[in-house]
Curated annotation (Swiss-Prot):
It holds the Pfam family HSP70. The gene is dnaK. The keyword Phosphoprotein applies. Keywords: ATP-binding, Chaperone, Nucleotide-binding, Phosphoprotein, Stress response. Residues 603-627 are annotated as: Disordered. GO terms for molecular function: ATP binding; ATP-dependent protein folding chaperone; unfolded protein binding. This is Chaperone protein DnaK. Signal peptide: none annotated. It comes from Azoarcus sp. (strain BH72). Residues 604-616 have a biased composition (Low complexity).
Length: 641
């Protein structure tokens, strides 16, 4: 049986590790480096370059050199963040037939998972060269805040690369595995702050020692799928472009070649400013105009860089607050803070994390390699090579379906330990409804429109029945990879339909904010919308039951009473259309009052029938039975008052 390798598929860099002799080993690539740039280039002769060779030729082949493609996985072309990237990236981002954001190189459209597959293939080859045998299985990491379709796309990328993805695990969880394996026995709570090249995650994890077994339980996770080192680089690029325009009057944003050189220089400057207080960006012959060639030389101090990215660092703190709150722990309960991702080497980031958590972050974890190491440990667990380790991960966002009135009914709450399964019984909204559409959603908002749509499917051939009668059981099943399977079953017929949510689009930055951060801010708005839906549904149900009762027992009341009920029903129907909650509730109350006589008539008939049956059975006096009937009617009327 071959080895299961662990791969950290990063936005900027990737890394591969394997268990050897019970210990994780990070494998050097063919260039001798322990990490590989997540860069893929398509040469003119059809050759595909991956890693350092691709990065080296980027300046001369900017339009066909792809980087940071992980940020496009599962995203729609129309999304604001994708549109922003279109202006920033030297390569072409194109719209796929299904509306997804793809890339275009040499006149051919390519899906992001295909590009990621090239990087995975390089990681696979790196491991095979080291092990001297074929590798077919892997554990691949993803940002904890990746949604279902993004996880599915990552799994697809593995399949394209010729790998069977045995498990998808969250990057902070993998880092916790790498950190916690060699720690002394005993319980501890850790915070993993993961600021990588393109994404940010924070996870609160409890490491417990239970009968000699290491148990890693994720208590809560949060993050931002569009915040990372690439954004820090971009701030430097924007600053240089602005300064150069002031000095030379030339806008470098229109020059693809210049932008590619600037990107390399910005990344280098950022790294240098982590250890030095000042750096110089010097790019001779950066561009030319009618007056001749232009040279770029600009000094950037650490203080200036920090001021440029201050808001980006601040953006990472709010998810930390939410994660602590969701985990039910205080800052003082955190024993260790682990920093993961190359961007955490920036002194200002370390300072901000220290300020928030009130303690110095650990320095004994390699931020570039910890995630891959954790992935290989999980591979060892799956293979049986690593024993006494239990990993309990969570789903980052709530999952549910759209129900009557556009409400999201949650079946699985965020931060639920996976794998997990949940079922709930729903019914039809109309009489003789023969099919239901199950609309699957992911997010935290009360109303369906505020959440991410993951897909929908139909359950048809439901036998004709009054509304509310059919029983449709909807089951959500999240596997250990965090990937969702949904089924709907008609309990009467046993007919069932299933769906594995397919990757159709990702979560935009705006969508994530709407789902998680803004959930609290919009709580009042959501509550009002929910109350309106409840009022509508209750009023609608009352109209339906009154219509039915009037059809069956209308002959037992006077014409005036019947007219009053019909008028009240019409008013209630108009109120539902108005969308005014107070009006709906008032008209519902009026309809209930108008229907009182009808209710009394129905009740009186039932009591009379019941009394007659009792009299026949007992053979007693009719007077006594009549008295019983009168008493019962009197009691009911008294209650209604």
């Amino acid at each position: 049986m071959g080895k299961i390798i662990g791969i950290d598929l990063g936005t900027t860099n990737s890394c591969v590790s394997v268990m050897e002799g019970g210990k994780p080993k990070v494998i050097e690539n063919s260039e001798g480096a322990r990490t590989t740039p997540s860069v893929v280039a398509y040469a003119e002769d059809g050759e595909i370059l991956v890693g350092a060779p691709a990065k080296r030729q980027a300046v001369t082949n900017a339009r066909n050199t792809l980087f940071a493609v992980k940020r496009l996985i599962g995203r729609r072309f129309e999304e604001k963040e994708v549109q922003k990237d279109i202006d920033l990236m030297p390569y072409t981002i194109a719209k796929a037939d299904n509306g997804d954001a793809w890339v275009e190189v040499r006149g051919k459209k390519i899906a992001p998972p295909q590009v990621s597959a090239e990087v995975l293939r390089k990681m696979k080859k790196t491991a095979e060269d080291y092990l001297g045998e074929e590798v077919t299985e892997a554990v691949i990491t993803v940002p904890a805040y990746f949604n279902d379709s993004q996880r599915q796309a990552t799994k697809d990328a593995g399949r394209i690369a010729g790998l069977e993805v045995k498990r998808i695990i969250n990057e902070p969880t993998a880092a916790a595995l790498a950190f916690g394996m060699d720690k002394k026995p005993g319980d501890s709570k850790i915070a993993v702050y993961d600021l990588g090249g393109g994404t940010f995650d924070i996870s609160i994890i409890e490491i417990a020692d239970i009968d000699g077994e290491h148990q890693f339980e994720v208590l809560a996770t949060n993050g931002d799928t569009f915040l990372g080192g690439e954004d820090f680089d971009q701030r430097i690029i924007d600053y240089i472009v602005t300064e150069f325009k002031k000095e030379q009057g030339v806008d470098l944003k229109n020059d693809v070649l210049a932008l590619q050189r600037l990107k390399e220089a910005a990344e280098k400057a950022k790294i240098e400013l982590s250890s030095g207080s000042q750096t110089e960006v010097n790019l001779p012959y950066i561009t030319a105009d009618a007056t001749g060639p232009k040279h770029l030389a600009i000094k950037i101090t650490r203080a200036k860089f920090e001021s440029l990215v201050e808001d980006l660092i601040e953006r990472s703190i709010e998810p930390c607050r939410i994660a602590l709150k969701d985990a039910g722990v205080k800052v003082s309960d955190i024993d260790d803070v682990i920093l993961v991702g190359g961007q955490t080497r920036m002194p200002k980031v370390i300072e901000k994390v220290k300020e928030f958590f009130g303690k110095e972050p650990r320095r004994d974890v390699n931020p570039d390699e910890a995630v891959a190491v954790g992935a290989s440990i999980q591979g060892g667990v799956l293979q049986g090579e690593v024993k006494d380790v239990l990993l309990l991960d969570v789903t980052p966002l709530s999952l549910g379906i759209e129900t009557l009135g556009g409400v999201m009914t949650k079946l699985i709450q965020k931060n639920t330990t996976i794998p997990t399964k949940a079922s709930q019984v729903f019914s039809t909204a109309d009489d003789n409804q023969s099919a239901v559409t199950i609309h699957v959603l992911q997010g935290e908002r009360e109303m369906a429109s505020g959440n991410k749509s993951l897909g929908q499917f139909n359950l048809s051939d439901i036998p004709p029945a009054p509304r509310g009668m059919p029983q449709i059981e909807v089951t959500f099943d999240i596997d250990a990879n965090g990937i969702l399977h949904v089924s709907a079953k008609d309990k009467a017929t046993g007919k069932e339909n299933k769906i594995k949510i397919q990757a159709n689009s990702g979560l935009s930055d705006e969508e994530v904010e709407r789902m998680v951060r803004d959930a609290a801010a919009h709580a009042e708005e959501d509550k009002k919308a929910h109350e309106l839906v409840d009022a509508r549904n209750q009023c609608d149900a009352l109209i339906h039951s009154t219509k039915k009762a009037l059809a069956e027992h209308g002959d037992k009341i006077g014409a005036d009473d019947k007219a009053k009920i019909e008028a009240a029903m019409k008013d209630a129907e108009e109120a539902i259309k108005s969308g005014d909650k107070d009006s709906i509730e008032a008209k519902s109350q009026a309809l209930a009052m108008a229907s009182q006589k009808l209710g009394e008539a129905m009740y009186g008939q039932q009591q009379a029938e019941g009394g007659a049956q009792a009299a026949g059975a007992a053979g007693g006096s009719s007077k006594a039975d009549d008295a019983d009937v009168v008493d019962a009617e009197f009691t009911e009327v008294k209650d209604k008052k």
